[in-house]
Amino acid sequence: MAVAPEADAPAQWHRVLTLLATVSLFIGTRAVWTQAASRELVIAAVISLCYLSILVSGVLALTARRTRTLARLDLCVLLTAMTLTLCTFALNHAGGDEGVLTAQAARELAAGHPVYGQPWPWLFQHNPDVALTPTMNGGYDLTYGYPPLVPLLTAPLLWLGHGALAATVVTTGALLVGAVTLWRLLPVPWRSAATMVCLGFGFLPSYARLGYPAIVALALLIPVVVRWPRIGAGGRLGWGGFARAACLGAACAAQQLPWFLVPFLLAGIYAVRRGELGARTAAWVVLRITGAAVTVWLLINTYFMVSEPRTWASGVALPLTQNATIHGQGLVGLALYYTDGSDRLAWYSHASMLLAGALLALLVLFVRRLGPATTVLPWCAFFLATRSQDGYYLLMTPLWLAAAVTTPATSFARAWQPRPRFLSGPRRRAALVATAALLLVPALACTAVAATGSPPLAMRVTRALTTGPTAVSELTVRVTNRDDSALTPHFTLTTGQGMTRWWTAVQGPATLPAHTSAVYRLQPPGPVFRVPRRPGTRIRLRVFTASPDTLSSMDIRLPGGRQNVKDHPAVRPAR
């Protein structure tokens, strides 16, 4: 006679999820252990114990007989992940440019000095490993460009040490709190997914160690996004609803990424509540949520709005207005890597904004279908932006998980969808498809305009001065402006996806008139430019201009290197 399985036996998918979370803890752990074993033996011992915990957890995940036992194992996996995160932080907490700027902003705040609009070049002079953000006008962004919540949280911790330590403590602590919050709010069988996404894969802890303010915003958004269609159910917010609205306002006061999520969330809440309660009550619910969020945002920003209104306004909007050089993994790579540039870079920004608006409109029109993807849709627009770095996508991925687990499609079954007469007739399916296509056409058209642009400057390297077999001290370049407007060129050399600092033009006109040529003598930002010896390295001479924003590039050969050079008529070996 067959024996019936235990009624309390965990589901197989729960076992697999716990096992995957356990396996994810191996990612990057060996490198941290190797680093610790050479100088911090206590941390190395703790990491070794974490290895033991991982192995034991793997066995128990496959052999636990009761759901409660597996749930306790999920807690053990979370604690192991938190321990590994803290061990890694103890070894690597110097911070990146965001962390360094945040810590300096906190110091200025504690000293009673202005925070916004103040350039701090010495931060980057004394930290050569900290990245600079170059701008299209040939300069760098050396000021603080985020809302003030994270400096306010960092200021009380400045006693911990110099550098960016206080800022990275805040962001790493926020990540741990966010991971625990998401773990606690998810249904029991799904909790290991929170461990895996927040801590296991390693990319979010690395951003936290760099001091990214977006990590604090993420932690504040987690309680907002979990079961978000229930906010205002029955027309009542209650203390929980007001608390979530306050978290939304605080997240917007920590970093700018939540600004893009807010319209989508509010539109989704309005649609769900209108389907339940009607237009007037739904509008009242959204108005109260907005009011609570704005109140918290204003409270956090009030001191800066009063003490430095102009610089505060320009500072918090800086990522949107700084006109940084193009960079990222999105469509802008066409101009960076696959062509010789474009004279229509601004159209990528137009396309990104139009796509964001189109996606918001599509969410409103098709909320019953797109509602579960509300926390993912805003980030799609960044794929077309001039700064389409993958951090804009992955920093908010825990919100994707929260929505996937807690906001099923059934939550939107009765949501209101606007259906004017031309979308509700006998041919409504064709009309809806046509409307969706028309909403996307402007963004696609702008993308096509940007992608088909041509480089406005033609270049030819005529001489390269060297001080050694692989050291270039000066380049001479002949530049021809083929555009109809005068351009102010700014030069740099790249050997990969990043960008080195600007080269100095010691000879040549600052502005090159239309349809003219000039010779420029360029010197590297350091004493020399080291030519990579690695075979296949691609060296590109890039020229950026502002007003209009353009990029002109060419592959070059330099003495002493073994580079792959694109077959291009302007590419000639330096003599």
Briefly describe each language-model feature range.
Residues 1-77, 84-213, 217-222, 231-234, ...:
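Primarily membrane-embedded glycan-assembly and transfer machineries that use lipid-linked glycans
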Residues 76-87, 422-451:
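Internal/C-terminal transmembrane anchor helices
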Residues 42-51, 260, 385, 389-423:
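Hydrophobic/aromatic-rich transmembrane helices and adjacent perimembrane loops
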Residues 547-575:
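Short beta-strand elements
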Residues 495-505:
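Short aromatic-acidic-glycine turn motif
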Residues 3-7, 62-65, 228-243, 270-284, ...:
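Membrane-interface junctions at the ends of membrane-embedded or membrane-associated helices
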Residues 173-176, 214-226, 241-244, 257-260, ...:
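Alpha-helical transmembrane segments of multi-pass membrane proteins
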Residues 199-206, 221-223, 239-267, 299, ...:
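Membrane-interface alpha helices of multi-pass inner-membrane proteins
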